[in-house]
Regions:
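Charge-rich, low-complexity N-terminal segments
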Residues: 2-150
Length: 150
């Protein structure tokens, strides 16, 4: 193996060892929420085709969750089927009654529960209304590196 090939092999090994490993799971839960400000905020209650004042009233969604969490090796120190079942059990009792909570607020609440059970891990949470519109929040322990020089 020449020097260039050796260098590239070492680089691949380093990248593999330092790889950011995550598992992800999905689950869904019915919920009812509302957005009180939609009734009075002129940017929302526009009176035209962009009017969303109806969001001030309680309305139903099927909330779709996708959760990513760090794992430390390829044998999965968090088994994703068990992780999914645990997450589903957090919401097993009836329909979610969320009042004014947004997708972002729901993600923050869920992050607190996950981080308590699985500390010291980067966690990303996506919450979507009916699988159409939603939010993703990345709860990073460290800020992502823009580039790595190997």
């Amino acid at each position: 193996m020449n020097q260039r090939e050796q260098s590239l092999a070492e680089q691949r090994t380093t990248v593999l060892q330092k790889a950011d490993r995550k598992i992800w799971v999905t689950f869904r839960k019915e919920g009812i929420h509302r957005y009180p400000a939609a009734a009075t905020d002129p940017a929302l209650a526009t009176g035209d085709e962009y009017d969303v004042s109806f969001l001030a009233n309680p309305h139903r969604h099927m909330f779709h969750f996708r959760v990513w969490i760090d794992v430390w090796h390829n044998d999965r120190d968090i088994e994703f089927i068990q992780f999914k079942r645990w997450l589903e059990n957090l919401y097993r009792d009836s329909t979610l009654s969320l009042d004014y909570k947004s997708c972002e607020m729901m993600a923050d609440d869920l992050y607190g529960l996950i981080a308590t059970r699985y500390p010291n891990r980067t966690i990303w949470i996506e919450v979507a209304e009916d699988g159409e519109n939603g939010a993703v929040i990345q709860y990073n322990l460290t800020q992502p590196v823009l580039s790595i020089k190997l």
